[in-house]
């Protein structure tokens, strides 16, 4: 690592810490030549392979801009979108892959978006999964309803078992 002050090609690591919720490492370094200290932040690279075969770095900003249109007119804040993008990136990085298809990024967006706002999820899924008919929308909506009912039934069972234990 070159010193940014004197361009000496050597430096010593003084301190290392996790940063950005564990997705990067912050290192405090000292130059043995000039004695000045500087900070570096190291992250693993994550490339998205587009349909054309061209790779580009993963971007939370692109995730947010892709989802923002689906969230227009919905009670979704910029903070919500930032948290969604962070969750998507964490899910992708947890797979351990250095490269991921753009299609997989879209799939990784669907889950967190569904938890955030079901209408925005339907809007995004209709474009991403290329809904072609009303039946496509109806099947997606019925799946959402079925899962919501199953979640309610599970919650009722859990509260019922808690009451019986009292």
Swiss-Prot record:
Negatively regulates transcription of bacterial ribonucleotide reductase nrd genes and operons by binding to NrdR-boxes. Keywords: ATP-binding, DNA-binding, Metal-binding, Nucleotide-binding, Repressor, Transcription, Transcription regulation, Zinc, Zinc-finger. Binds 1 zinc ion. Its cofactor is Zn(2+). This is Transcriptional repressor NrdR. A zinc finger (unnamed) spans 3-34. Belongs to the NrdR family. It comes from the Bacteria. One of its GO terms (molecular function) is ATP binding. GO terms for biological process: negative regulation of DNA-templated transcription. It comes from Paenarthrobacter aurescens (strain TC1). Residues 46-136 form the ATP-cone domain. The gene is nrdR. InterPro entries: ATP-cone_dom, NrdR-like_N, RNR_NrdR-like. NCBIfam families: transcriptional regulator NrdR.
């Amino acid at each position: 690592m070159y010193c940014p002050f004197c361009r000496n090609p050597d430096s010593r690591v003084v301190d290392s810490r996790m940063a950005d919720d564990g997705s990067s490492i912050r290192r405090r370094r000292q130059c043995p030549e000039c004695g000045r200290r500087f900070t570096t932040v190291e992250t693993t690279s994550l490339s998205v392979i587009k349909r054309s075969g061209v790779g580009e770095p993963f971007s939370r900003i692109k995730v947010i801009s892709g989802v923002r249109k689906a969230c227009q007119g919905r009670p979704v804040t910029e903070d919500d979108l930032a948290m969604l993008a962070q969750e998507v990136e964490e899910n992708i990085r947890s797979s351990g892959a250095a490269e991921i298809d753009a299609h997989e990024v879209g799939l990784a967006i669907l889950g967190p978006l569904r938890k955030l706002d079901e209408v925005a999820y339907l809007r995004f899924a209709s474009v991403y999964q290329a809904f072609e008919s009303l039946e496509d929308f109806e099947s997606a909506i019925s799946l959402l309803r079925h899962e919501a009912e199953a979640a309610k039934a599970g919650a009722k069972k859990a509260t019922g078992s808690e009451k019986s234990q009292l």
